[in-house]
Amino acid sequence: MTSKTLILICNQFPFGRGETFISNEFNYLHSAFDKVVILSRTDETVQTRQIPNDVELFKISPKSNLLQKIKFLFILVSNRQRVKRLLKHEESSVYSIFKKPATDSQKRKMKHDLFKALEIKNYIEKKIIPKTGTNVIVYSYWQNSSALSGILLKEDKLCNQAISRAHRGDLYFDVQ
């Protein structure tokens, strides 16, 4: 029997002061999986919350340095059809919701989020999947580029399932 692994992608947990609700559900997650991996998108260095010793913790900076931007160009070139398809889908989603084309600002945000999603997906594919195998559920605490990275991993059959928590701002456009 293969072991079940959870990859939890969050912005700070177990660092910093945010994402306090993860603390409340973490014991349930930990007991439901054979292995738990946390990928925290933070530059924080001080761990403020305790996690069990058997949980693997990875960090990826939310900021992109020059080397990451250069790497992204290679990722972008090798995924250009996928990028084109995803951006077209995003633009059509904006049109279906707002009944007008995406603004330049929205298009820049879409490209940035896709860049970050590909960066996170690439990190998980290269650094975490070799240690865990693909019997994995990716759980993004936020519906942002982290959630999109889970979808990309699922499309590439590198995980069994990709899920994301929905917060009020994800559901209601008047709350941002």
Q: For the regions a protein language model found, what residue spans apply to each?
A:
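Short N-terminal targeting/anchoring amphipathic segment
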Residues: 96-98, 108-117, 121-145, 163
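A short acidic, amphipathic alpha-helical/loop segment
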Residues: 21-25, 149-153, 176
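Membrane-proximal helix-turn-helix segments that form the acceptor-binding/catalytic region
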Residues: 25-28, 125, 133, 161, ...
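A conserved catalytic-core segment of Leloir-type glycosyltransferases
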Residues: 45-115
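A short, histidine- and acid-enriched strand-loop-helix "catalytic/donor-clamping" loop
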Residues: 12-16, 144-147, 156, 160-176
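Short, well-ordered alpha-helical microsegments
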Residues: 45-46, 146-150
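N-terminal subdomain of nucleotide-sugar transferases
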Residues: 1-70, 131-134, 160
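Active-site catalytic microenvironments for nucleophilic, acid-base chemistry
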Residues: 32, 153-156
